[in-house]
Amino acid sequence: MLQFRRLQKVPHFDFILKLDSSVYPETAQHIKDALASGKPSVVTIDKKGAAGRIKEALKGTKCSKGTDRDEWPMSMFKEGGKGASIRKISPSDNRCAVSSIGHALSDILDNAKIKFEIV
């Protein structure tokens, strides 16, 4: 007898980036919530297109004094831009997380796939 069943696709990624929720609690919670709402955990680096995507992502979300607008997926990823999850968080949490993520991925070439995990 022959049995056939569809196998679940396993997402392809090149690197795993683990974000420590005890160091960046607001950013980590935003990403967790965005993932729970269907935003991708595997994203593709595209640094050249980031400037245009951040404008699209933040369009219509006004700045508030004492907060930064955090987006997931971030604009440095092809999946970012229009439709990204936006949350206002503390500037120190946002800027430290963005700086750390940018530094960790600085030598990684465009089109690399990164899987984000919150720990």
Language-model segments: residues:
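Nuclease and nuclease-like effector domains acting on nucleic acids or nucleotide cofactors
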Residues: 1-69, 73-119
